[in-house]
């Protein structure tokens, strides 16, 4: 039995993975059994065995349908995600729909097997674990695994699950750019604050993070990215280009009908792409590619840049967004650090350099190993390493997307805003929407838009057994708690009974596609006006409804009945009932209509209530509004609803007739 070894850091990449360990005061990146410091994230199944890493990638042309890679592009996503559907076109292995989740179907030892992306990733992690154990001569269980900073909740949870499946104890999920920043900043004694932009373009994902580094404190200011952009996409552009060229040269023969031919072409394209980072031209020579035809061709760097120009240019959008969110202009960034193999592409470097007005880019860290390096440092810190190098290191990371829940009117009320430092915990009190409501449905969303329908539903749960009471009286305390992995726990407690329910948002929901994330965040700017208009409309509607109910309950109060004439009381009741009836039939009216109706209602109610006060001589004792917040409170000692107190009109986080809950200040 091997003794227990130190904790390791693993960079689980889309195309390559890497493992490092911090010992004797420094990080060592560990080479695998082939002597390579990075291992392909490939798993192959044959009639006799399972191969992982180099061995799997080396036989891919002979066995394309049973060699699985790019699992990171499936992890935590739904089958019908557009990105997944686009990717399936490029893969030789079969992806099937298993209850909305993508599963990979392969032939293994003469049987058909299905694997989830988590299982495939766990096999790659297992290879990294064994690589570390062979080097250390000890058993490895504790690890820190990296994920793209822009990975959402489902993807983080799924990655953690993959670690668990492979028999690892996942101490922490760390964001890749943050890990790379540690690799950049660990040995630098930064006395005064420096703003560092990490530009991390890998095989399948792209992240930009801005950190301030000072005295061993690494604080993430903002993060942005695209979980579906990387070297694989550049390879695909080359493959498509040569498939067309082959058709032209050989009487319309279509390579895509032969999976092995496409795989051989893809391998050649990846090699050519790498060559083009240092040469102006690359040659492709593949013998007997299809039906005995040899394919000899070449491609220039200029042509490659043209084929990928839109993809290369799109890397600047997250840079702009990260700067905006961090409230920094270009000049305030001290260092631009390149991470990820795809940052070796000269055009990508040139675009970034031009964006920063010709500033020199920082290439001081190894782009393939930096993330594993940082993860290894974090693993050492979490296991209490006393080494001087990591003694005073502090990491402050952020949540990439806003998190909240649905409140009345389909509005998303954010409890945690994007780029909030994690871990974090936010609690807010909500109340019921209708009288004697027995339970509330708590629906948790992630995204930047005002209305829940434009955001991503992460999960939902019911809090039942609320004692019967008028609307607005029960108080339900909802807590959002994001741990240091960026994974969300939500709990709800009914304050009167102490009844509690909680949910860890797990991966039952897939995740947003690149299109959706872009639509949510970038378009949020364009949609802002619409969002605000909708919020105001819902707030006006809630305001009117609340005012009507409040007035009704005020004049039904025994103490008020004594002080008000029956005819006046009936007038108020009838007008309130008429208003509520109108509201039921006009859920989608404009803000102005609701405001007009409220003025009408006030013109009936206010004189009567004011007269009652004068007669009562302003003496107290007339109830004010309904207890429990979210309802109008009265003037001192009186029953005139004062505006719409407690999360009502003008409060963007209140909403219209929602299914369940409404906000309380």
Swiss-Prot record:
Q: Where is the composition biased (Gly residues)?
A: 629-658
Listed GO MF terms: ATP binding; ATP-dependent protein folding chaperone
| Keywords (A to Z) from UniProt | ATP-binding, Nucleotide-binding, Stress response
Cysteine disulfide partners in this protein: none
Where is the region Disordered?
A: 629-665
Query: Which Pfam family, any one, appears in the UniProt record?
Result: HSP70
The family note in this entry says: Belongs to the heat shock protein 70 family.
Name of protein: Heat shock cognate 70 kDa protein
Native organism is Echinococcus granulosus
Query: What does UniProt list as this organism's lineage?
Result: Eukaryota, Metazoa, Spiralia, Lophotrochozoa, Platyhelminthes
């Amino acid at each position: 039995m091997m003794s227990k070894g130190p904790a390791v850091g693993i960079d689980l990449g889309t195309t390559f993975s890497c493992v490092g360990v911090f010992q004797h005061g420094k990080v060592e990146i560990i080479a695998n059994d082939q002597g390579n410091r990075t291992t392909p994230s490939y798993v192959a199944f044959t009639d006799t065995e399972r191969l992982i890493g180099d061995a799997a990638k080396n036989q891919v042309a002979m066995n394309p349908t049973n060699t699985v890679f790019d699992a990171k592009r499936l992890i935590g996503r739904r089958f019908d995600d557009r990105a997944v559907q686009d990717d399936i076109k490029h893969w030789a292995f079969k992806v099937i729909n298993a209850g909305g989740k993508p599963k990979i179907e392969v032939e293994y030892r003469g049987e058909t097997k299905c694997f989830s992306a988590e299982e495939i990733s766990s096999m790659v992690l297992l290879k990294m674990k064994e690589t570390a154990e062979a080097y250390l001569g000890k058993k490895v269980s504790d690890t820190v695994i990296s994920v793209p900073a822009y990975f959402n909740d489902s993807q983080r949870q799924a990655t953690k699950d993959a670690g668990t499946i492979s028999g690892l104890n996942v101490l922490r999920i760390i964001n890749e750019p943050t890990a790379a920043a540690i690799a950049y900043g660990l040995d630098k004694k930064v006395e005064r604050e420096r703003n560092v932009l990490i530009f991390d373009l890998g095989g399948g994902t792209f992240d930009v993070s801005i950190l301030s580094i000072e005295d061993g404190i690494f604080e993430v200011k903002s993060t942005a990215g695209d979980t579906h952009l990387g070297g694989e996409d550049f390879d695909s552009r080359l493959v498509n280009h040569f498939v067309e060229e082959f058709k032209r040269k050989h009487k319309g023969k279509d390579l895509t009908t032969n999976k092995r031919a496409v795989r051989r072409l893809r391998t050649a394209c990846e090699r050519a792409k790498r060559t083009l980072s240092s040469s102006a031209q690359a040659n492709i020579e593949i013998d007997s590619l299809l039906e005995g035809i040899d394919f000899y061709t070449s491609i220039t760097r200029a042509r490659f840049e043209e084929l990928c120009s839109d993809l290369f240019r799109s890397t600047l959008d997250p840079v702009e967004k990260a700067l905006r969110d961090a409230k920094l202009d270009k000049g305030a960034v001290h260092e631009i650090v390149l991470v990820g193999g795809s940052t070796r592409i000269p055009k990508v470097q040139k675009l970034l350099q031009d964006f920063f007005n010709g500033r020199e880019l920082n290439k001081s860290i190894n782009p393939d190993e930096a993330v594993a390096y940082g993860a290894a440092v974090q693993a050492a810190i979490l296991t209490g390493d006393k080494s001087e190098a990591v003694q005073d290191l502090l990491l402050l990371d952020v949540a990439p997307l806003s998190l909240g829940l649905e409140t009345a009117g389909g509005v998303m009320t954010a409890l945690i805003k994007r780029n909030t430092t994690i871990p974090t915990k936010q609690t807010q009190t909500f109340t019921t929407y209708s009288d004697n409501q027995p339970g509330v449905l708590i629906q948790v969303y992630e995204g930047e838009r005002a209305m829940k329908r434009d955001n991503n539903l992460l999960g939902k749960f019911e809090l039942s057994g609320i004692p019967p009471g008028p609307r607005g009286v029960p108080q339900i305390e909802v807590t959002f708690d994001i741990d240091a992995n960026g994974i969300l726990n939500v709990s709800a407690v009914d304050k009167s009974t102490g009844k509690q329910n909680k949910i860890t948002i797990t991966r039952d929901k897939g995740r947003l596609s690149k299109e959706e994330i872009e639509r949510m965040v970038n378009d949020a700017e364009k949609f802002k006006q619409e969002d605000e208009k909708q919020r105001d409309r819902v707030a006006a509607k809630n305001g009117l409804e609340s005012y009507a109910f409040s007035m009704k309950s005020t004049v039904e109060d025994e103490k008020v009945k004594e002080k008000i004439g029956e005819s006046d009381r009936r007038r108020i009741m009838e007008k309130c009932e008429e208003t509520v009836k109108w509201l039921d039939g006009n859920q989608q009216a404009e803000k102005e209509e609701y405001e007009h109706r409220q003025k009408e209602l006030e013109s009936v109610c206010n004189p009567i209530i004011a007269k009652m006060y004068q007669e009562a001589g302003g003496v107290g004792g007339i109830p004010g509004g309904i207890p429990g917040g979210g309802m109008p409170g009265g003037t001192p000692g009186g029953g005139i609803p004062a505006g719409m107190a407690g999360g009502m009109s003008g409060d963007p986080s209140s909403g219209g007739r929602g299914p369940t809950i409404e906000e309380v200040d």
